[in-house]
């Protein structure tokens, strides 16, 4: 259970960071 929770949290964090980076790139590209 702990491993699954950690993996899920890690995956969520990686996805969140990736989305934020892409969003910043898109904004900087637009402006």
Curated annotation (Swiss-Prot):
<dbReference type="GO" id="GO:1901895">
    <property type="term" value="P:negative regulation of ATPase-coupled calcium transmembrane transporter activity"/>
</dbReference>
<dbReference type="GO" id="GO:1901881">
    <property type="term" value="P:positive regulation of protein depolymerization"/>
</dbReference>
<dbReference type="GO" id="GO:0016529">
    <property type="term" value="C:sarcoplasmic reticulum"/>
</dbReference>
<dbReference type="GO" id="GO:0051117">
    <property type="term" value="F:ATPase binding"/>
</dbReference>
<keyword id="KW-1133">Transmembrane helix</keyword>
<keyword id="KW-0703">Sarcoplasmic reticulum</keyword>
<dbReference type="GO" id="GO:0004857">
    <property type="term" value="F:enzyme inhibitor activity"/>
</dbReference>
<dbReference type="GO" id="GO:0043242">
    <property type="term" value="P:negative regulation of protein-containing complex disassembly"/>
</dbReference>
<feature type="topological domain" description="Cytoplasmic">
    <location>
        <begin position="1"/>
        <end position="7"/>
    </location>
</feature>
<comment type="function">
    <text>Reversibly inhibits the activity of ATP2A1/SERCA1 and ATP2A2/SERCA2 in sarcoplasmic reticulum by decreasing the apparent affinity of the ATPase for Ca(2+). Also inhibits the activity of ATP2A3/SERCA3. Modulates calcium re-uptake during muscle relaxation and plays an important role in calcium homeostasis in muscle. Required for muscle-based, non-shivering thermogenesis.</text>
</comment>
<dbReference type="InterPro" id="IPR008028">
    <property type="entry name" value="Sarcolipin"/>
</dbReference>
<dbReference type="GO" id="GO:0090281">
    <property type="term" value="P:negative regulation of calcium ion import"/>
</dbReference>
<keyword id="KW-0256">Endoplasmic reticulum</keyword>
<keyword id="KW-0472">Membrane</keyword>
<dbReference type="GO" id="GO:0070296">
    <property type="term" value="P:sarcoplasmic reticulum calcium ion transport"/>
</dbReference>
<feature type="transmembrane region" description="Helical">
    <location>
        <begin position="8"/>
        <end position="26"/>
    </location>
</feature>
<protein>
    <recommendedName>
        <fullName>Sarcolipin</fullName>
    </recommendedName>
</protein>
<comment type="similarity">
    <text>Belongs to the sarcolipin family.</text>
</comment>
<keyword id="KW-0812">Transmembrane</keyword>
<dbReference type="GO" id="GO:1901077">
    <property type="term" value="P:regulation of relaxation of muscle"/>
</dbReference>
<dbReference type="GO" id="GO:0033017">
    <property type="term" value="C:sarcoplasmic reticulum membrane"/>
</dbReference>
<dbReference type="Pfam" id="PF05366">
    <property type="entry name" value="Sarcolipin"/>
</dbReference>
<comment type="subunit">
    <text>Homooligomer. Can also form heterooligomers with other sarcoplasmic/endoplasmic reticulum calcium ATPase (SERCA) regulators ARLN, ERLN, PLN and STRIT1/DWORF. Monomer. Interacts with calcium ATPase ATP2A1/SERCA1. Interacts as a monomer with ATP2A2/SERCA2; the interaction decreases ATP2A2 Ca(2+) affinity. Interacts with VMP1; VMP1 competes with PLN and SLN to prevent them from forming an inhibitory complex with ATP2A2.</text>
</comment>
<dbReference type="GO" id="GO:1901894">
    <property type="term" value="P:regulation of ATPase-coupled calcium transmembrane transporter activity"/>
</dbReference>
<feature type="topological domain" description="Lumenal">
    <location>
        <begin position="27"/>
        <end position="31"/>
    </location>
</feature>
<dbReference type="GO" id="GO:0051924">
    <property type="term" value="P:regulation of calcium ion transport"/>
</dbReference>
<dbReference type="GO" id="GO:0010882">
    <property type="term" value="P:regulation of cardiac muscle contraction by calcium ion signaling"/>
</dbReference>
<dbReference type="GO" id="GO:1902081">
    <property type="term" value="P:negative regulation of calcium ion import into sarcoplasmic reticulum"/>
</dbReference>
């Amino acid at each position: 259970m702990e491993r699954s929770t950690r993996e899920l949290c890690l995956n969520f964090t990686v996805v969140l960071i990736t989305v934020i980076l892409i969003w910043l790139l898109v904004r900087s590209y637009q402006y």
